[in-house]
Amino acid sequence: MASQQAPAKDLQTNNLEFTPTDSSGVQWAEDISNSPSAQLNFSPSNNGCWATQELQSLWKMFNSWLQPEKQTKEQMISQLVLEQFLLTGHCKDKYALTEKWKASGSDMRRFMESLTDECLKPPVMVHVSMQGQEALFSENMPLKEVIKLLKQQQSATRPTPDNEQMPVDTTQDRLLATGQENSENECNNSCNATEANVGESCSGNEMDSLLIMQKEQHPEHEEGNVVCQFPHGARRASQGTPSHHVDFPSAPTTADVPMEEQPKDLSRENISEDKNNCYNTSRNAATQVYSGDNIPRNKSDSLFINKRIYHPEPEVGDIPYGVPQDSTRASQGTSTCLQESLGECFSEKDPREVPGLQSRQEQLISDPVLLGKNHEANLPCESHQKRFCRDAKLYKCEECSRMFKHARSLSSHQRTHLNKKSELLCVTCQKMFKRVSDRRTHEIIHMPEKPFKCSTCEKSFSHKTNLKSHEMIHTGEMPYVCSLCSRRFRQSSTYHRHLRNYHRSD
């Protein structure tokens, strides 16, 4: 638990801070060896275990801080609650908060009654634009919920040919849906500044902008893509080094992005081989239009994330890939590009040829498969198609012409055609087995003395499982209980037969 600057006596953290040392990873900077609560009777650690020393240090640290011999449980809980509230980062002025804590006399109830929302930081809002629908959402809202709300807004206010070129304004109802009405003016000003300056650096308290483009295909032509762009905002730039600033594009209106325009995405050949640096070395052929011949005919959304950090030297920024623009501008300087694609599923490997097996024609799957929103359920799509597109049974026995699906099944079957049939044949009853282990297990039946004997009644059994079932008679154990009539059974076969005969209708 990281320490915060707090009152001297009430919070017990005025002179406490973490200092890393060689002997312990986390220790208090103050000397706690003289504290009466820190004098604990720990047995000396002979093995020098670092984990034991660390636990002892933490035990002494918390006893010295909370002082359980002097404070009540409520006082200690209040200290922990206030410390955790300071660690969340929502507090705007920690010093003012500690002053209120001292003024309340370390009483948590009085302290909470005096608190207002003025001590909290303003919420961070994100401007989202998708197919002409715009709204403000909290940065912690899931992306699925954002897309769902924007689709509902689009269905409620579907544009007509007359007003198709007009952008849809952010409504107050959408702000209420995010629970952040109090930051409407600040977020709207930031959105307007973003739309006015495309490709230029951001300044002030402008928020992050999320651009979502979703295209719906016709059954004969094309498949729609969802292109999401998460540029870095000025808020994240303030936390980094001052050597560069962060630039992000504005959300285009419906006039900039026609509804019938083909979706664009990054080609796999245009990404540099050095994936660690994610440096894009090609601008001329950076986009690729997916035609309807290479994309499945059902509707699916693919997610494309493109983050770009610009250096402050060029005056004109690059046009972000994945966002359609009316005209292209020559980019100056260099840019570091982090590209993550969740819609790539390619199969380019040739089928394996197994010598001695039946030949077959196999259709290659080389078209890209776009994953939908529920991409976790679609992940095994490639292996599923590979497995079920081939013939049902591939492996053929050359002696009896039997077909098998797996090689291990064919290998097990071929043992029956071996010349060493004496190893697989029971001498007593002339029964043939596929494995030598099965024959040995079977031969126990023909033995005059059975190896497993009951210690109570000295009855012998050929198998150990039969002995265990027999011993339940002496112990009275009945592990199988019917949940419907509470009858108990000794064996599972008897239990299942009871269910079939008496509780089939239930």
Swiss-Prot record:
InterPro entries: SCAN_dom, SCAN_sf, Znf_C2H2_sf, Znf_C2H2_type
Protein name: Zinc finger and SCAN domain containing protein 4F
BP terms from Gene Ontology: telomere maintenance via telomere lengthening
Source organism of this protein record: Mus musculus (Mouse)
Region of interest (Disordered), residue spans: 1-24
Entry annotated with the keyword Secreted: no
Gene field: Zscan4f
Ranges of residues in domain SCAN box: 37-119
Role description: Transcription factor required to regulate early development. Binds telomeres and plays a key role in genomic stability by regulating telomere elongation. Acts as an activator of spontaneous telomere sister chromatid exchange (T-SCE) and telomere elongation.
Free-text tissue specificity from the UniProt record: Up-regulated in blastocyst outgrowths and is detectable in a mosaic fashion in ES cultures.
GO CC terms of this entry: chromosome, telomeric region; nucleoplasm
Main location: nucleus
